[in-house]
Structure formats: C-alpha cells, structure tokens
Amino acid sequence: MARTKQTARKSTGGKAPRKQLASKAARKSAPSTGGVKKPHRYKPGTVALREIRRFQKSTELLIRKLPFQRLVREIAQDFKTDLRFQSSAIGALQEAVEAYLVGLFEDTNLCAIHAKRVTIQKKDMQLARRLRGERS
C-alpha cells in the first residue's frame, strides 16, 4: 500500500480517553529519583550525519567572511605592505579556498574508507595531498 502524507484533523468527538489504573497513576505522580531530568542526547553519529546532509544541500559559504578577510590580509602583508583588496576579490578567494578544502576532505575521506576506517586522520590528508601531487 502506498504511503500518504498525514494531515492534522479537527476532532469531532469520538471516544473519551480511558482512565489510568491506580498503579500507573501512582507511578506517574511520584517524583523520580533525584528529580532532575537528563537532557536528551542523540546517538553518536546521528547529529554528524544530519549536519552532513544539511551542508551538502546548502550553497552558502561555510567560513565566516571577516575572519577569512583578516587571514588574507595577514598573509598578503608578508609579500607587500599596504595592499588593498576589492570585496569581490576576497569573495572569489573564499569560494576557491572552500572548493579546494571540500575536494581535499572528499579525497581524505576516501583514503580513510580505503583503510577500512570511518574517521579521517592526519595520515589520510597527507596521502590525499601526496596523490594529488601537492606535496612529496
């Protein structure tokens, strides 16, 4: 049978709620030990997978603009003092940097999977860069 989307409907009477048994009511009304409710925690990896799906759907830049701009200006100071940048130039640099990093992390993840692991490590990133020919 095909699934259909469930929509909320206004109640038009129907059955009255059943009364709870005495033991159930006593259990619910009695305070639990300590009285402090633990905060809800997801299983390890659940939030990570949710974030992966969210970021794969999105197209916005992930590195904050101002810290990236400060870093670019700091690096540029080593080459020439009093350099000025158009905002579009810094935007283009940021797009290129993020595209490079996403590709590097994809290759790093493949290296970790090849080693039968799910966690990326420093050696995976080193191998990915070496295979790309960026570092010998």
Swiss-Prot record:
Organism for this UniProt entry: Candida albicans (strain SC5314 / ATCC MYA-2876) (Yeast)
Post-translational modification: Phosphorylated by IPL1 to form H3S10ph. H3S10ph promotes subsequent H3K14ac formation and is required for transcriptional activation through TBP recruitment to the promoters.
UniProt modified residues of type N6,N6,N6-trimethyllysine: K5, K28, K37, K80
UniProt cross-references to Pfam families, sorted A to Z: Histone
Region annotated Disordered, chain positions: 1-43
InterPro entries: Histone-fold, Histone_H2A/H2B/H3, Histone_H3/CENP-A
Annotated coiled-coil segments of the chain: none
Function comment: Core component of nucleosome. Nucleosomes wrap and compact DNA into chromatin, limiting DNA accessibility to the cellular machineries which require DNA as a template. Histones thereby play a central role in transcription regulation, DNA repair, DNA replication and chromosomal stability. DNA accessibility is regulated via a complex set of post-translational modifications of histones, also called histone code, and nucleosome remodeling.
Keywords: Acetylation, Chromosome, DNA-binding, Methylation, Nucleosome core, Nucleus, Phosphoprotein
Assembly mode: The nucleosome is a histone octamer containing two molecules each of H2A, H2B, H3 and H4 assembled in one H3-H4 heterotetramer and two H2A-H2B heterodimers. The octamer wraps approximately 147 bp of DNA.
GO molecular function: DNA binding; protein heterodimerization activity; structural constituent of chromatin
PROSITE patterns: HISTONE_H3_1, HISTONE_H3_2
Name of the molecule in the record: Histone H3.1/H3.2
Encoding gene (name): HHT21
Residues with N6-acetyllysine modification: K10, K15, K19, K24, K28, K37, K57, K65
Subcellular location: Nucleus; Chromosome
GO biological process annotation, one example: rRNA transcription
Similarity remark: Belongs to the histone H3 family.
Positions carrying N6,N6-dimethyllysine: K5, K15, K28, K37, K80
